[in-house]
Amino acid sequence: MMAEKKKKELPRKVVADNRRARFDYDIGEVFEAGIALKGTEVKALRTGKATIHESYAGGKNGELWLFNSYVPEYLEANRFNHEPRRPRKLLMHKRQIHKLTVAVEREGMTVVPLKIYFNEQGRAKVEVALAKGRKAHDKREAVKERDWNRDKARLMRDRG
């Protein structure tokens, strides 16, 4: 009898986080998407120096693409390296892509990436969300509300 090999469970490692998106947008429905990468991009992502704070997703020919995301060049790749700001294809079901593109076209919403991470199987995933842009006064209101909730929690903790 052969012993079964146990697959090594990798923890979910967040590579890039778009914290600014939660401040600039009202986040709606969140989706998980795969991302089509080249080999050097995967290795560069594992170093953890990618940024997505200025990136967005958009539909093109029935496909969803991630634009303006920055994955630095992999130092050991020499001439076979990738372009750091190239558009990257997001892998989702057709129904999900259709839902996102309809929301963008009809309701004026935006598709923003929230984070890039490696799942338990070691595959790169992108968490994208439907979002509506906030005005300056909405941002101030959100900050006030967050501060009030923090003060309220502090008071409840001290009293109770």
From Swiss-Prot:
Subcellular localization: Cytoplasm
Gene (UniProt): smpB
Listed Basic and acidic residues bias regions: 138-160
Its job: Required for rescue of stalled ribosomes mediated by trans-translation. Binds to transfer-messenger RNA (tmRNA), required for stable association of tmRNA with ribosomes. tmRNA and SmpB together mimic tRNA shape, replacing the anticodon stem-loop with SmpB. tmRNA is encoded by the ssrA gene; the 2 termini fold to resemble tRNA(Ala) and it encodes a 'tag peptide', a short internal open reading frame. During trans-translation Ala-aminoacylated tmRNA acts like a tRNA, entering the A-site of stalled ribosomes, displacing the stalled mRNA.
Protein name, as recorded: SsrA-binding protein
Keywords: Cytoplasm, RNA-binding
Taxonomic source organism: Azorhizobium caulinodans (strain ATCC 43989 / DSM 5975 / JCM 20966 / LMG 6465 / NBRC 14845 / NCIMB 13405 / ORS 571)
Pfam families named in the record: SmpB
Spans annotated as Disordered: 134-160
Predominant localisation class: cytoplasm
